């Protein structure tokens, strides 16, 4: 029951913040132009800053565990490959990019640290999970959303060049690269810089959620209901059921296992919507999946934690 209450305390505010954006649009405080500008702002500034902060403040040298990093990297890679293969079943295929991204990409950074701190009193192995998965999440999201853009056509030389340029200049990628270099060089974080960066980073999630709520049209978000349900199932249950036994077999327990559970089975992040919207996709499918996974993850995540706790693994 405590785990359920904790998970609800994490997920319900996310759900309500999203609905606030929808409410503000309904009463006229938000209009389409304002929501589009807010989406663009979150994509270009707060979101890259949040990723920069998450990675830059990790002491990579001190936290490093090769086995953990390699395992998280490999299962994330396999999850992406499975999502790409499953997306081939979609007809019409205009939502392939959104389906792939939303089915593998978790709220790992924020939720992982929160859950582990609640269970063990410190961040534990969450930073390692972030190092192994979050950069890969974002790099592959840029690739997937570029390659599977609805109007993309064939990947000829011109399209490939434009795609590669979009990847290299993507604000998300730049934030990750800057954060990684900062951490590797062990550059200091002066108090003034830390507070300023922190304040800006804190705006990413609430603004992104309200922008998503303001863009939400329920009939569009769930117009491809079977695909949305399939995507939600893979995000919350499918990959967890596939890889959690493997993690246990590899000897991961306690905070390491909790990190892996969060990485595999937490809700799709609002970043899915923000990036899709800003990279030539409609974004409606992403918003529907974020809504569904946020709603159900409190129960599925609690179930996975309960099972592992009952087995004495966490």
Positions of predicted regions on the chain:
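Alpha-helical transmembrane segments of multi-pass small-molecule/ion transporters
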Residues: 1-314
């Amino acid at each position: 029951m405590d785990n359920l209450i904790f998970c609800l305390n994490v997920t319900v505010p996310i759900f309500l913040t999203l609905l606030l954006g929808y409410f503000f649009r309904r009463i006229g405080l938000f209009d389409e132009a304002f929501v589009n500008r807010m989406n663009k702002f979150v994509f270009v500034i707060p979101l890259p800053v949040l990723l920069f902060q998450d990675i830059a403040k990790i002491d990579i040298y001190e936290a490093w565990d090769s086995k953990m990093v390699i395992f998280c990297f490999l299962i994330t890679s396999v999850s992406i490959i499975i999502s790409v293969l499953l997306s081939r079943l979609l007809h019409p295929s205009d939502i392939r990019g959104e389906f792939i991204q939303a089915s593998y990409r978790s709220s790992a950074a924020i939720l992982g640290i929160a859950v582990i701190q609640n269970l063990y009193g410190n961040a534990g192995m969450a930073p390692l999970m972030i190092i192994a998965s979050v950069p890969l999440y974002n790099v592959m999201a840029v690739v997937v959303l570029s390659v599977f853009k609805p109007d993309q056509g064939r990947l000829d030389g011109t399209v490939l060049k434009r795609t590669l340029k979009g990847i290299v200049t993507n604000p998300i990628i730049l934030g990750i690269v800057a954060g990684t270099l900062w951490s590797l060089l062990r550059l200091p974080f002066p108090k003034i810089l830390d507070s300023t960066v922190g304040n800006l980073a804190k705006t990413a999630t609430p603004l992104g959620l309200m922008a998503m709520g303001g863009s939400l049209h329920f009939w569009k978000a769930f117009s491809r209901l079977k695909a949305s349900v399939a995507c939600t199932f893979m995000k919350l249950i499918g990959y967890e059921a596939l890889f959690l036994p493997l993690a246990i077999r590899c000897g991961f327990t306690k905070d390491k296992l909790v990190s892996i559970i969060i990485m595999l089975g937490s809700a799709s992040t609002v970043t899915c919507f923000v990036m899709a919207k800003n990279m030539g996709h409609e974004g409606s499918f992403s918003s529907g999946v974020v809504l569904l996974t946020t709603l159900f993850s409190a129960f599925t995540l609690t179930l996975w934690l309960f099972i592992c706790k009952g087995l004495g693994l966490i």
